[in-house]
């Protein structure tokens, strides 16, 4: 999946990421840009417009939770399927989340990282992160296969 150099680049960069802010924004943007994903979060309260979503404390808290799990995956890049096995089972068997949503969230995460880190998030680093988010999405979709 990733070369040793790519792993070093993404893990080194990840240490600079403000997980709470980036997670909140990434999940919020997912819910705004792809509104059909909101059906999994109806219990979060007001998701009626972009401002409501982006300022919703439950969206922010869950976004941090999502990125905390992603952070754990960053520590286990060689075993993403094992790392995300329980979450894959939960999202497949209990929550019935369309696995395409994992890919969408990964792409939104890359946008948010670029927004937060500007020129430091180089095209090469973006390419490396695209590999990571694809690997995480595949690991989360593993139970579906």
Curated annotation (Swiss-Prot):
GO BP terms, alphabetized: hydrogen peroxide catabolic process
Globin domain ranges (all copies): 1-145
Binding site residues for heme b: 62, 91
Modification sites for Phosphothreonine: 11
Transmembrane segments: none
GO terms for MF: haptoglobin binding; heme binding; hemoglobin alpha binding; metal ion binding; organic acid binding; oxygen binding; oxygen carrier activity; peroxidase activity
N6-acetyllysine: residues bearing it: 58, 81, 143
UniProt keyword terms in alphabetical order: Acetylation, Heme, Iron, Metal-binding, Oxygen transport, Phosphoprotein, S-nitrosylation, Transport
Gene3D superfamilies recorded: Globins
SUPFAM superfamilies: Globin-like
Tissue: Red blood cells.
Pfam families the record matches: Globin (PF00042)
Residues bearing PTM S-nitrosocysteine: 92
UniProt GO cellular component terms: blood microparticle; haptoglobin-hemoglobin complex; hemoglobin complex
Chain's role: Involved in oxygen transport from the lung to the various peripheral tissues.
Family note: Belongs to the globin family.
Assembly mode: Heterotetramer of two alpha chains and two beta chains.
Protein name: Hemoglobin subunit beta
Organism (species): Ovis aries
């Amino acid at each position: 999946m990733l070369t040793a150099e790519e792993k070093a680049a993404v893990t080194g960069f990840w240490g600079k990421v403000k997980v709470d802010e980036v997670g909140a924004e990434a999940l919020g943007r997912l819910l705004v840009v792809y509104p059909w994903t909101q059906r999994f979060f109806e219990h979060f309260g007001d998701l009626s417009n972009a401002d409501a979503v982006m300022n919703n404390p439950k969206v922010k808290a869950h976004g941090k939770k999502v990125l905390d799990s992603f952070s754990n995956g960053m520590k286990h890049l060689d075993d993403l399927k094992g790392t995300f096995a329980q979450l894959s089972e939960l999202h497949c068997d209990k929550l019935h989340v369309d696995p395409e949503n994992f890919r969408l969230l990964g792409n939104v995460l890359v946008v948010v990282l670029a927004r937060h880190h500007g020129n430091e998030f180089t095209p090469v680093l973006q390419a490396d992160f695209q590999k990571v988010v694809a690997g995480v999405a595949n690991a989360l979709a593993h139970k579906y296969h």
